[in-house]
Amino acid sequence: MCPSYMVTLDERDTTRARANMLRSVIDGTLPPQELTGEHMKKVMDLCVGCKACKTECPSQVDVASMKTEVLYQMGREHGFSVRQRAAGHMRRGLALAALLPSLYNASSSTRLARRAAALAGIDPRRRLPSVARKTFSKRFADLPQGAGPARVALFNDTWNEYQRPEIGVGAVRLFAAAGVEVLLPRVVCCGRPMLSEGLVDEARKNARRNLDLLYPLVESGVPLVGLEPSCILTLRDDYRKLLPEDGRVEKLSGAARLFEEALLELEAQPPLSEGSPVLLHGHCHQKALVGTGPTEDALALASDVEVVDSGCCGMAGLFGYERGHYEISMKMGERRLFPAVRGAGERVVVAPGTSCREQILDGTGRRALHPAEYLAQLLAE
């Protein structure tokens, strides 16, 4: 069921209401201008793009893709806001911040920075994202490598490159311990932030660029491994819709793996010591398109795993950062996730999604780990 409806109990926030509104425009019950009108904007506003309706709804209505199309049409008619363009091109912004990480991190926590962010539509109660002192790509050459012949290609997403390179470091160490060589191909943003803002043309351009960059590896049989579920699953799911006529897409989609899937497919697992019990919160796109099974099984190589039946965490990419969404975002988290984390005791909290980990930190003060980060801590010396 739609996460926003679960906290508002407003019929307008149901999958049914959103689908019916669109159907009414398509069949002529409502005039065409309603597609980009104020009422449509309100109906779509609290859709968090979780994709649950794509698998849980009996009709398999993909409202997340519908919202992307609505935002695209609104942008074409009324123009895209500065906030939308900045959010869609987050990788570009973080790359600039990473040029002077200490200065950026020091200034981003100031009251002036929060006020400036508020002018761009960010709720001032949210912490602004920090950047790492050294990007993942600059650390990569110094990391250990497996002797092969098994190889994987790591899709270096925005968050791993600029914010949490320790996750990528952990993943490479785990693969190396299993004898696997990790390749780091050049990539551009997967396009997920652009799709979330309706910037479909820009997302399509990035999809085509990534396809050109990655296809030679994929064609040679190298699996493409992603650390951020929403990024790698954009390649697996959304690229088919963005580039339906490109015959290479199916091969790329078939080669895309979540980190945990790739780890489980190895002939030999890395040597791990026994870890603490784990509380796992799954990412929405992963739950909708893959399920949490691979993550549970990967963590179970070293730990007892309990899964939170929590639905959406409430952050949903940039949704929870936006002014006007903060309260409902926190209510989504408070439904089940935050109480479960507060009651986790000695269990280590694990969440594959970047926005999920940020929401858990904001809502409970507790830092959640990525599966690769957690398992790398357990590598036997």
Q: Residue ranges of each PLM-predicted region?
A:
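Iron-sulfur cluster-binding electron-transfer modules in prokaryotic oxidoreductases
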Residues: A64-E381
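Cysteine-centered iron-sulfur cluster-binding motifs in ferredoxin-type domains/subunits
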Residues: M1-P3, R12, H39-V61, G93, ...
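Glycine- and acidic
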Residues: P3-V7, V25-P32, H39-T55, V152-T158, ...
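Ferredoxin-type iron-sulfur electron-transfer modules and their immediate structural context
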Residues: M1-L46, S65-G79, G88, L103
